[in-house]
Amino acid sequence: MRTLKNIIYLGMKELRSLMRDKAMLALIVFAFTVSIYSSATVTSGSLHLAPIAIADQDRSQLSERIINSFYEPYFLAPADIDISQMDGLMDSGTYTFTMDIPPNFQRDVLAGRRPAIQLNVDATRMSQAFLGNSYIQNIVTGEVNTFLAKTRQNTVLPVDLDIRARFNPNLNQMWFGSVMAIINNITMLSIVLTGAALIREREHGTIEHLLVMPVTPFEIMMSKVWSMGLVVLLASLGSLLLIVRFLLQVPIEGSITLFMCGVALSLFATTSIGIFMGTLARSMPQFGLLMIMVLLPLNMLSGGMTSRESMPQFVQDIMQTMPTTHFVSLAQAILYRGADFLIVWPQFIYLIIIGGVFFGAALLRFRKTISAMA
């Protein structure tokens, strides 16, 4: 009972210390509001409002059909330019695409001469250039074929292919980006808060005060784990409800309660990692460097940004020992596919085991550090 009281008391002390740290509070608010919204809305897997200009030297029915086939939301309304303006507009970056339809284009098409349309692409805009190039080729080819046939061509297939996209019918990138941003920020902040709390006490000299109190290293460490974990847990819940569900209108298919249980288990592991890193670093700059070395692989190789099946087998095996891999798996299953506990229980077991291992390793390292300071 005394141990529990000490853990609660020390945890409340950590929360009061965090409330006085304006920079850390600003980071928490930013990470679960602006960062989530921008990650969801800025990243897009499709072409969106790409600027295009067309120099129509033919002024024929076919060239008009091609020009009118570029419309929102994929392209802005095509600008009508002169051929002499094309190079200057590309150099200034005004348009991502400029197209030159040559004279007598329609006549040559009808005569079967295979005339060429020049398409200039500003490759410095990588996303638009890569996607727009294929979009424009398909649009121009489709309009030319339609014009030649005088009617829309419907290819009759020997079988009916009925394609249905499950869990994200419109293939909306925002649904994926918002949830993955929350997952990544949960990992990042849980490590930062616990590690920074330990380093802050060392820099301010308050860790020496704890050494003369009747508390154990386990109680000190556990207080930091539950207090900083609680902050991240509540912040992630608020972000999921207010930013993702309410503001972005992203549907949550599964149980939020079950997801938050998974968050709590993941926080148990990641906060322990933060404590371990805090014992290794001697200052906040060193801790920041360690963060880069640890956080990037955890986020990049957990299966959220890149499919795990696309990674080398030895990388997959290594990442199975990391909590983020199983957290991403259960989060996607619950929030996207509406999975219940009977489906995600293996991930829960993995998180408990991995969290226990990291907590034990961090506790041993923390005790060694405390003994060296005593």
Feature map (PLM): residue ranges:
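Long, hydrophobic alpha-helical segments
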Residues: 174, 178-195
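Membrane-interfacial helix-loop-helix junctions in multi-pass membrane proteins
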Residues: 167-171, 303-358
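Extracytoplasmic/periplasmic domains immediately adjacent to an N-terminal transmembrane anchor
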Residues: 1-175, 343, 368
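Transmembrane helix boundary and interhelical loop/hinge segments in multi-pass membrane proteins
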Residues: 191-213, 225, 370
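Transmembrane helix segments
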Residues: 37-47, 281-321
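Short, membrane-interfacial amphipathic segments enriched in basic
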Residues: 1-11, 76, 314-325, 374
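Alpha-helical transmembrane segments and their short interhelical loops
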Residues: 33-37, 217-291, 296, 342-348, ...
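Junction motif at the cytosolic side of a transmembrane helix
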Residues: 2, 197, 276, 335, ...
